Curated annotation (Swiss-Prot):
Record keywords, A-Z: Cytoplasm, NAD, NADP, Oxidoreductase
The organism's place on the tree of life at top rank: Bacteria
Statement: the UniProt record of this protein carries the keyword S-adenosyl-L-methionine: no
UniProt-recorded Gene Ontology molecular function terms: glyoxylate reductase (NADPH) activity; hydroxypyruvate reductase (NADH) activity; hydroxypyruvate reductase (NADPH) activity; NAD binding
Enzyme class: oxidoreductase
One family name in Pfam for this protein: 2-Hacid_dh
Keyword Cell cycle attributed: no
Broad class of where this protein is predominantly found: cytoplasm
Quaternary structure and partners: Homodimer.
Name of this chain's protein: Glyoxylate/hydroxypyruvate reductase B
Coiled-coil parts of chain: none
Length: 323
């Protein structure tokens, strides 16, 4: 008898066929607590936000069937990993295939924020380009400015490569430990958070959401940045205190922001961020290319096949459950 799999996102036909070869697949409508519980997977319920968890220890205890959860993402803050650990449920993600694409998105945010690409393009469409442009249309340079990277993982390293080699930008970074490859390849300079905030012309956030990183950038941290600085966030929205960021953008504490992630997603249509001309807001498109999303789905399928065969070798979030 084939193992049973719950499929909560559609897959390309060839990948769905591959799943069907190995498993009995049931498509479900999202990952609401009720839907997961109905199918015996309480331990993998999603979190509605960082602090309110669905599928805690008691809920996971109700689950007698779930053996593995495979997510099409690099982030896993939407899973209650502690509950999964308690039940011996393996969680696998897809961290490697999206690295270059997300770094591209971050560099696009750097450029579009600095050169006001979205803002001035809309002005052209509105018919405001009627004579030679003046300073009120100007942006700021990117090349040779200091890039500060908060979180030097795979994506941070790929961003450093683009900034250093493509734009001649000195690289500063802060992370849990020194990154020898970043320092040797891109002459990246490790510094403490206060120094990163004070000296960066572009502060690029590439951090996961954890108890330690929630609102890591708030009013106090934003006040330490240059008035000319631009904040880029393509990590997780709640790493930045959104209300503090709005205030800093309105009172010119910082120059601008390029955002691909938000505290609430989708971003509410009445969000004050959408009223600010110095904000570039994207709908969490960091990895959203046809090629990369296919690769992520392929890896998620491969991960699940390996996990249910007891052969997980990579991309395991909680390898301790395999021991």
């Amino acid at each position: 008898m084939k193992p049973e799999v719950l499929l909560y996102k559609s897959l390309p036909d060839d990948l769905r066929a591959r799943l069907d070869e190995h498993f009995t697949v049931t498509a479900i409508n999202g990952l609401s607590p009720e839907t997961i519980a109905e199918h015996g997977g309480a331990g993998a319920r999603r979190r509605h936000d960082r602090l309110q968890q669905h599928g805690g220890s008691s809920a996971a205890g109700e689950n007698a069937k779930l053996r593995a959860a495979s997510t099409i993402s690099v982030g896993y803050d939407n899973f209650d990993v502690e509950a999964l650990n308690q039940r011996g449920i393996v969680l696998i993600d897809t961290p490697t295939v999206l690295t270059e694409t997300v770094a591209d998105t971050m560099m696009a945010l750097v450029l579009s924020s600095a050169r006001r690409v979205v803002e001035v393009a809309e002005r052209v469409k509105a018919g405001e380009w009627r004579r030679s442009i003046g300073p009120d249309w100007f942006g700021i340079d990117v090349h040779h400015k200091k890039m500060g990277i908060l979180g030097m993982g795979r994506i941070g390293l790929a961003l450093a490569q683009r900034a250093h080699h493509g734009f001649g930008m000195p690289i500063l970074y802060n992370a849990r430990k020194h990154h020898e490859e970043a320092e040797s390849r891109f002459n990246a300079q490790y510094c403490d958070l206060d120094t990163l905030l004070r000296e960066s012309d572009f502060l690029c956030i590439s951090l996961p959401l954890t108890e330690q990183t929630h609102h890591m950038i708030g009013r106090e941290q934003l006040a330490k940045m240059k008035p000319s600085a631009i904040l880029i966030n393509a990590g997780r929205g709640p790493v930045v205190d959104e209300q503090a960021l709005i205030a800093a953008l309105k009172d010119k504490t910082i120059h601008a922001a390029g955002l691909d992630v938000f505290e609430q997603e989708p971003l509410p249509v009445d969000s004050e961020l959408l009223t600010l001309p110095n904000v570039v807001a994207l709908p969490h498109i960091g990895s959203a290319t046809h090629e990369t999303r296919y690769g992520m789905a392929r890896d998620a399928v491969d991960n699940l096949i390996a996990a249910l065969a007891g052969k997980v070798e990579k991309n395991c979030v909680n390898p301790q459950v395999l021991r």
